[in-house]
């Protein structure tokens, strides 16, 4: 089987991570793969905010928990130490789709490097808040951006789950 197809079929969402931060080289490889995602009209209208600062990571987790309505003490990032936030340029008509493809590439690249990942939502709501718009400005990011998702990344603690059987009736051929 082709390596890429095998990676697509064996990647799983991971919900239990070790606290150890992945090596910067590993994160850079994952990010690079994300930047090579297909995008509409070659605009490359998505960016990645790589969060490895524990204080900011924990602040994002707390806000994500609040937005999601989760109980106190729950970490919606499942203990993953690194958070790669994908944002789309609001002026780019394909930005949301482009950002979604970036997310897919990030998760596949993490899997290829034997790291775990999972897509966590609520980035849109986070980056609608003034303090996170200001964070982007402080980092030198100009323009209006919409949060697409958090790709949380780390070393897997335990075994990856087995894939659920694929449901029938999801492909329709027009021959």
Please state what every model-predicted region is:
Residues 1-175:
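Acidic, surface-exposed loops and disordered segments
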